[in-house]
């Protein structure tokens, strides 16, 4: 029978002193703890950044929603006096044609003022103006002495708001010499 062997310590067997290894293990544990703390801090920072981005996105959506909801408020406010004038005209008993016409002219001036304050402008091309597909809609083309693609007749005014066409002017254009 062989005698039981004493347990062999691999550290001592490798010729390394235990206190040196323990110091290295302690240093590595400290580095690991520092790295874990840094990773945790970075993760919390990333979560805060994601939450802030979500808050910014939500606020932007709310701003867009409010702009859509209340963007027309100024225009609507400028139309209220026009409506008041029309109602007052209808409330007047037995008006003469001349008085009615004058009232309509005043009301039209109010409406034009409201349009102007809200950057809504007429598109009313004159006869001979060059056809612009961004501002005009050709309803028909007729032989005419004017060069091709020029306005011969305005059928209905169009409108632009700021620089955007709200409704194109309806026009008849020249097909050129017939």
From Swiss-Prot:
Q: Does the keyword Chaperone apply?
A: yes
Q: Enumerate the UniProt keywords alphabetically.
A: Chaperone, Cytoplasm, Stress response
User: Origin, by domain of life?
Assistant: Bacteria
Question: InterPro entries from the entry?
Answer: GrpE, GrpE_coiled_coil, GrpE_head
Biological process (GO), any one: protein folding
The record's GO molecular-function terms, alphabetically, read: adenyl-nucleotide exchange factor activity; protein homodimerization activity; protein-folding chaperone binding; unfolded protein binding
Q: Localized where?
A: Cytoplasm
Assembly description:
Homodimer.
UniProt similarity note: Belongs to the GrpE family.
NCBIfam families attached to this UniProt entry: PRK14139.1
- Descriptive protein name: Protein GrpE
Q: Which organism is it from?
A: Bordetella avium (strain 197N)
> What's the encoding gene here?
grpE
